[in-house]
Every structure is written in C-alpha cells, then in structure tokens.
Amino acid sequence: MSMASLYRRSLSPPAIDFASFEGKQIFNEALQKGTMEGFFGLISYFQTQSEPAFCGLASLSMVLNSLSIDPGRKWKGPWRWFDESMLECCEPLEIVKDKGISFGKVVCLAHSSGAKVEAFRTNQSTIDDFRKYVVKCSTSDNCHMISTYHRQVLKQTGTGHFSPIGGYNAERDMALILDVARFKYPPHWVPLKLLWDAMDSIDQSTGRRRGFMLISRPHREPGLLYTLSCKDESWISIAKYLKEDVPRLVSSQHVDTIERILYVVFKSLPANFNQFIKWMAEIRRTEDVNQNLSSEEKSRLKLKQELLKQVQETKLFKHVDKFLSSVYEDNLPYVAAKVYCDGDEILSGYESDESCCKETCVKCIKGLGEEKVTVVAYPSGNDVFTALLLALPPQTWSGIKDQSLLQEMKQLISMVSHPTLLQQEVLHLRRQLEMLKRCQENKEDEELSAPA
C-alpha cells in the first residue's frame, strides 16, 4: 500500500523559523552579544539526513566535519570526509536505518571517531548546567552541542530526534536548533526551557532519559596510523577475542617466555583479523610527495613516518619481529606473516609497479598524467601487532603465573618511557577497543564517559 507524500511540516509556536523576520531579529541580537560564534562553522557543513532515521548520524557527521576532525580514511575518491555511511562502528547501518540509534551509541561513535566528548542525560544534569553548556558552545567555534529530544514536547510530529544546537539568545533564553531533518522542519529557535523539557523524556528503546553532548576537537588528530574497522559484524568476535580470550589464554596455558606469549596470542587470531585493524598511512613515493602534496599533507606524512619509527624502536617490536621471523607463514593467519614491503620501506621511497606481496594492499595507481602513486592501505606486518599489543589493557597479562615474566611483559607494554606521539596513538586504539567492548556488551547507554 503506497503512502501519501508530504512536503515539509509547519512549525508550531513557540518555535520560530530561523529565516522569518523575528528569527532574523533573534539571530542579530545573539550575534551582537557574541553567542553565535559556533553557528558559522556548523552552518558551513549543515546537511540533511539521508534516511528518515539517520538524524543521529547526520548530526554527528556535521559536527565532526565542522570541527575539521580528520577521519583518517577515505569517503569517496581521494577525499577524507565524515559521512553517515562511515559512522557504523557502534551499530550496523541497516539497524539504524530501521530503528534509529540511541544516545549512548551516538556518544560511542563520537568517541570512536576521535572527538573529545562530554555527554549528559537530564538526570545527570540540571537546566542551569545545560544553559551554561549552551553558552559555552555558542561563544566558541571549537565546541559544538548535539541535543536529543522528543519532538512532541515541541509540538512537532515524530518522536525522538537528534540535532546540533547552532546558537543562543541570552535575553530571550532561546536556543537555535539546526534540524537535520530539513525535508521536514527548517532551523528554528525554541525556548531553552522547552528544549530541556523535550530532552527530559524517556527513550522507550533504552528506558533511559535523553540528553546532550559536547563535542570538541582533540589536541591532535586521532589515529595517525591505526584505527579499528567495524564494517561488518566480524568485529564482535574479534573484540571478544582480544578482550576476553587473550587474558584467558595467557592465564590458562604455560607461558615461560615472551615468544611463547606471542605464540599463544597469534595462533588463535580470527581469520578475518586483517579487516579489523587498518593502516591509515596513505603514503606516497618521495617524489610524489614533493610534487603534489600541500605543506599540511607533507607535515602529516612526516608525523606518520616518525610514529612508525617509534613503534619499530620499542623493545616489544623486536620481540614481535624475532617471533614472526622464526615461524613459517602458513603456521599463522596470513595477516601476521612477515612481509617484504613493510611500511617503513614505502616511507623511505621503495618503488615498484606491482604489489610486492598479496595481503599488504600496496597499490600503484595512476596520478596526474602517467605518474604512478604508491598507496599503502594497511600493513601486514610486525608494527601492526606491536601497536595492538601495546593497546591491550595492562590487566590483559595479569594472569601470567611466572612473576618475573609478568614483570618483563609489563615493562614491554608500559607507556611511561615511550614518546608522547606513540602514547597518544596507543591510547586512541585502547579507547576504541574499550568502546567496542561496551557496544558488544550493550553497555554504551550505561557509561557515557570516555574510556580511561
């Protein structure tokens, strides 16, 4: 049975259309008072949700792009850009398309995308706190707010909804909602008290109250080299292996050397592990870097090169390298094999018209004219596993019975002596693992704070 078509909805008072005469007045008043600073960054990336239930994804991608947070992976063509289709780590897109997404899962996505996030439910805050945070985001261009609320409290059709808050008029105590369902409602001003009441409602899917989150740019780009991929449900089994099986394996089996620990971890790696951790190097040959990259891109590649060098200078890397060199390729998942074309060789200008191994995803593609550009999608080497072992929580190894071996392992994975750049990269991976664990256990709506 076909559904009757609709063309937008009329705003009901007390909401005021942003483009109306009064809406413009409210905007000008707020602009004069300095509470529209965040508006311009947001409006530059204002988007319409691509599916009726994608309001949470659209709001988040809009905010991440407005903060110039680099996703570290391509959207389309050569472009790195946040799109709703890329925000799938905490809930499969098909489920979001059908049922929408919870507040906790949007918070999870924001954390996993590398943003700094502060999230509050209405029962964890007050209207005065909310007003203070609205002012904070409205007077700055490096912090934005996403609100989740029940539309019917605002006399609008629909139920739960997400949208960014684009500004605030203090004299009128009104907030600007940049409604991402632009096919339905235009941006509009609403009394802040009414918006609070709309947030102070129960989400029937979780039994928890709605709320708001503050999203800001981290001190540095997250995931310069490594990130976790959750494009399909395989990540569930892999996250379980890393967070549950590895601690059990090292505590239940006799391990008396570091090499034996590595063997126990690697021998049971899920077959699809190479799709779980991806390398975001996007490295090109030296002459191509000099010719076609901006100074910002060159600086980024230099950081990646330094980070890769730091990984390979760790004592743990030397153990991993020795271990993988001592076993045959077919005794381990292929992704763990020692390969010829490690990332450092590409970084130093290794040239070849063909991929030098099957699984490293080294591709030579045509650039301008007949020039070829070497792109490394993800490594299949020792540095990946070194980074992963460093990223596992320290308590992973607490079940090792040999106390001297336990102390040696603790020293190998300790972040204290490592450079700041490597520490930040490892902590980013560790937080991603923790967020995935929360999602796997359906605890993302219980704990909104960033993983420690």
UniProtKB/Swiss-Prot annotation:
Annotated Peptidase C83 domain residues: 1-220
Signal sequence, renumbered to the chain: none
Catalytic activity: [Glu(-Cys)](n)-Gly + glutathione + H(+) = [Glu(-Cys)](n+1)-Gly + glycine
Keywords of this entry: Acyltransferase, Cadmium, Coiled coil, Metal-binding, Transferase
Ways its activity is controlled: Requires cadmium for activity. Also activated in heterologous system by AsO(4)(3-) ions, but not by Cu(2+), Zn(2+), Mn(2+) or Ni(2+) ions.
Entry keyword Transmembrane helix: no
Official protein name in the record: Glutathione gamma-glutamylcysteinyltransferase 2
Organism annotation: Arabidopsis thaliana
Originating gene: PCS2
